[in-house]
Amino acid sequence: MDKHYPVIDTRSIVMRWGDMDAVGHLNNTYYFRYLEQIRLDWLESLGHGIDPSGCGPVLAGTACVFRKEITYPATLDISIELEKLGRSSLKLRHHFYRRDDPGVVYASGEVTLVWVDYQAGKSVAIPEDIRAAVETAAKSAA
């Protein structure tokens, strides 16, 4: 998960005191919550919120490798990188950086999203405007 792909966006998250576990570092479940939050923010910035009556992404897979502990306080910059753009799926990679330590990767993550018709429960093509935005951002980053 160390490989870097074209960065199509970067989002920031401010760690909260309650995001720590008893050991005093960011609880491992919050890495996944942070990925979820930046993913939803990014999709909303493209004009696509979650509409349970229509079509949208579902999480088909996710993983995270914890490289260095993150302690409070911290502002995190999390990259959104394009690994693969398919007909109905999108594979993204992520790197977690502390704003006060920008050259160090604290964690690496990945997610696979599949666009589905929520009512029919079947995969559908990624909307053309999302596809175009992702392709344009990936070309600009290359």
What are these regions (language model features)?
Residues M1-D41:
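Catalytic strand-loop segment that frames the active site of acyl-thioester-processing enzymes
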Residues G24, I80, G121:
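Hydrophobic pocket/interface hotspot
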